[in-house]
Amino acid sequence: MLHRRYPVAARGARARSIAAALLCTVVFWAVTSVTIAAVAPVRLRWELGAESEKTTVLRDSVPAEFTLTNTGTRALPGKGWTLYFNCMEGVAIGARPGHVALERVVGPLFRLRPTAGFEELRPGQTLRVPLVHPDSLVNPALAPEGPYLVFDDAPEVGLSIVDYQVAPFPADHATTPEQIYERNLGIVPLAASRLPPVFPTPHEYERHAGTLRWTVRPRVVAPPALRAEADAAEAMLQPYFSSGPAAAGASTLRLAVAATHGLLGPEAYELNIDPEAGVILSAASAAGIARGLASLRQLLPVANAPDRGVVLPALLIRDTPRFAYRGLMLDVARNFQSKAAVLRILDLMSRYKLNTLHFHLTDDEGWRIEIAGLPELTAVGARRGHALRADDRLPPAYGSGPDVGNPYGSGYYPRADYIEILQYAAARHIEVIPEIEMPGHARAAVISMAVRARRLAQAGQPDANQYLLADPRDQSVYQSPQAYSDNAMNPGLPSTYAFIEHVVAEMVALHRAAGVPLRTLHVGGDELPDGAWERSPACQALMLREHLKTRADLWDYFYTRVGAVLGHHALSLAGWEELGARTVTVGDHTERSASPVFSRSGYTLYVWRNAEGAEDLANRLANAGYGVVLTPATKLYFDLAPYRSPFEPGQIWAGYVDLDTVFDYVPYDDIRVASDDPRHVAHRVGLSEAGLAHIRGLEGTLFSETVHEASRLDYMLMPRLLALAERAWAPDPAWTQQPNRARATPLHAAAWSAFVSQIGLQVLPRLDAEHAVLYRIPPPGLKRVHGGVLANEQIPGLSLHYTVDGGEPTVASPQVTGPITAIGLIRVAAFDRNGRAGRSSQLDNR
């Protein structure tokens, strides 16, 4: 699902109009077969023009260019070949294109072909093709990707262009080192003694005099009901002591389920470190014990050799989370992530007390979970690659290229892997909420079931259409934001509900086999394209039969049926905000309002719109009775770039989300955060007391269009995930409760300094030592002052090193300890404790 490429309201309309304009007219070719003994090697380069070169081909666009060079010994013929590539942001042919034509194939897949008059490209020759992109293409992650060649005499074979380069981006309007320096100026590093003892900030704590010293392995004492948590505690202590049982008379780590007086919620805990009594961890439940152990882990030495012992500060922590739901949405449909990658994410979530993995398993570009009885869902829907027909795979997307072996384009979780993920999460007291997208964003399922129907029909099976999701007679014309025209399940077909029932029953069975009962299923509900269903005979017949008058009625009918399926399996229903929201006209403006149809059904909606007229949408839905998970795009979408830069990957459709953006999020108050101008909030609705009770919690969101390597997953998540954990667990900070901005500002500055100091001095060093995570290391800020260069960093504790000749610094380069007075091209980079560098910044001091 990418409701996210095009922002809401006015900006969304503008972006959609650009996208529509970028669709090229389909061109048909009659090409004679060309026999080629060997494919000529080629080099492809894509380069974005400077903003000063604004094109007149399309408004709000920028020029670019493909440069195709024949690097082989044979000519590339004048006809009989096609260049395919993906481009999320859209592309059109530029002015004076020569004898080539460009068209969109499907979704983000485009192709470029020679037309009549094109001359062969001899060895060493270069073809230049002018292109036009929307001006939202501002970093390399959004550039064309995954190019490959196909020759007409071998139409099923896609040949990857390995020698593909994206030229460095122009730095027009990019965030500068000077701007970064100014943003970092307010950060005042704090000593550890002034920071909370554990992360996220606990509800309350008391530091006492003295220490508890463990010179030998302590005894872990726990009742049988906490056996799993006791085993986790033993494993946590293993690196610090020799193997074997605790010695007689050793100090104790005592675990107990007990009342947590004054602390509400099943995850509340009390951690008491006493020099005489040892460690006593009591909690309202086993989950609370797990959260307390996560805190205790942070108090252990970062690194220690066995038998060196452990010294713990005398301390009392009484803690409970602010929000019961603290989630992360991980998209593995657009680009697949391995089981090992998911387990690593669960480890991170457990460390920082997040308790829900919203697992986005299906979308237009992939179906990632094995469903017994429907093998086509993975045999077709889990594979991407080049093919003339969608008989055994989906088309390339997001740079996956022609090869079905690409591990990010293709892949799924077999039954055993999914069960292992569930059990791994459950052991860490993390609930997995799988998402099966419907009725939109369902192309992988729609195509897979069409392949199944054709196969069974050819075999003479009378029930070939048992799970068909598309009406064969449907003449509806629509286009999703991702440019698909065939991605919607049809609510007029009984087979659609048979499919949903089958999938839901199998998901329930998978969870039961894991010993982790499924409680909630997320059923999508976002971005059904305008025009879908409108010319479907099956839908028209259903509407006549059920006395439905509008497409909104058809929507409600669909989700009433879906809700009944989930109810039959005793499941709670969750979905994106669109499931329960409607657009209505009020006076001279439109606004998103709560539909009364499902408001008393116990459904939970994930609300992502929080800008451009939707600042109060979460309030309206919660006030109406819907459960609400706050997942605001402009604050908690981790697929967005941190700021404008040609070096920072990520989407920009909802703005930019840096570490401080997440930290600054104020739950319950998107209206105040959005604007101080009363004209902008005049029609906005506040959160009622009843509505407040319907807010379930917060969720960070990572869609994966740009995540096609393991390091990118870490880079996009961390350290922003830490700010999410702080905001979801920690008490409401003082600065959010101060209505006077002049008084709130210094409180906020102090809280921000404390947060970055804690993650820089305590959290990340432990992560460096214990859990290899390639988190984003921010580039330093730089400023020229009195002939020298000053440098600063967003995260205290990282070391800064510099060069004076423009070369990339290493950890062996001089360390920044004050103003850099050398004359030259100054380049500075930050390094973690393992000597890993972040992106460098440079400033000319000549």
Question: Where is each model-derived feature located?
Answer:
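Short, compositionally stereotyped local motifs that mark structural "simplifiers"
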Residues: A37, V221, R743-R846
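Acidic, contiguous N-terminal accessory segments
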Residues: A38, A143, Y148-A324, A574-T583, ...
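Low-complexity, acidic Ser/Thr/Pro/Gly-rich terminal tails and inter-domain linkers that flank the onset
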Residues: A38-R59
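Asparagine-centered strand-capping/turn motif at beta-strand->loop junctions
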Residues: T67-T73
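Short acidic, flexible loop segments centered on an aromatic residue
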Residues: T73-V106
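Feature activates predominantly on carbohydrate-active enzymes
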Residues: A268, N272-R512, V516-T520, E699
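Active-site neighborhood of glycoside hydrolase catalytic domains
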Residues: S480-G602, G613
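Flexible, acidic glycine-rich loops studded with aromatic residues
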Residues: S572-V785
